[in-house]
A protein has these predicted regions:
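Acetyl-CoA-dependent GNAT
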Residues: 2-3, 7-79, 83, 90-96, ...
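Short secondary-structure transition/capping segments
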Residues: 74-75, 117-119, 139-142
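Conserved catalytic-core motifs of GNAT/GCN5-like acyltransferases
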Residues: 67, 108, 126-142
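A short beta-turn/loop motif at secondary-structure boundaries
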Residues: 38-41, 112, 134-138
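Short aromatic/hydrophobic contact patches that present stacked aromatics
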Residues: 73-75, 106-108, 144-146
Length: 150
C-alpha cells in the first residue's frame, strides 16, 4: 500500500465528510464549516489528507492561534485504523508546525477516546487540563493535551 500526504482541497470535501460520518470520535463538522474553511484559503489553517490508491484514508485540520497550533479535527477511516496512518498524519502536521515557527500544539480529546490519547502520548503530548462537560452529546469531559515545540 503506497501512502501519500498532501494538502486537502475543496474537491476532497465529499470524501472527508463521508469518512468523518463513520468516525465516531471525530469532531463532526457541518458541510458549511468545511466549505468555509476551503473558501477562506487562510494561512492560519492547515488541512492535510493521507490517501492510498483507493482514496482518502484520513485527514487532520489545525489552526494557528498566536504561535500555537490547535488540532481541530483528526479522523482515520475505520479499516485503516491501527496501521500507523494517524501517526504519519500527526508527524507531518508537527513537522509543518515546527517549520512555520510554532511554539506548541494543543488539542482537546474525549476522555473515553483511549486510542487517540495513546497516539498523542506516543508523540509526547502532555495532559495540561480538562474541560468539564465539553462534549455535550454525551456530557463527557475533554482532556486538553499540549506539546511544546521549542
Amino acid at each position: 500500500m503506497k501512502l501519500s500526504i498532501r494538502s486537502a482541497a475543496s474537491a476532497d470535501l465529499p470524501a472527508m465528510m463521508s469518512l468523518e460520518k463513520h468516525a465516531a470520535t471525530a469532531a463532526h463538522w457541518t458541510a458549511q464549516q468545511y466549505e468555509a474553511m476551503f473558501r477562506a484559503h487562510s494561512p492560519e489553517r492547515t488541512a492535510l489528507i493521507i490517501e492510498d490508491e483507493s482514496g482518502l484514508q484520513g485527514f487532520v485540520i489545525a489552526r494557528v492561534v498566536h504561535r500555537e497550533w490547535e488540532i481541530e479535527n483528526i479522523a482515520v477511516a475505520g479499516p485503516a485504523r491501527r496501521r500507523g496512518l494517524g501517526t504519519r498524519l500527526l508527524g507531518e502536521l508537527l513537522d509543518q508546525a515546527k517549520g512555520r515557527g510554532a511554539d506548541a500544539v494543543f488539542l482537546e480529546v474525549r476522555e473515553s477516546n483511549r486510542a487517540a490519547r495513546a497516539l498523542y502520548e506516543k508523540w509526547a503530548f502532555l495532559e495540561s487540563g480538562r474541560r468539564r462537560g465539553y462534549y455535550k452529546d454525551q456530557d463527557e469531559d475533554a482532556i486538553v493535551y499540549r506539546l511544546g515545540l521549542t
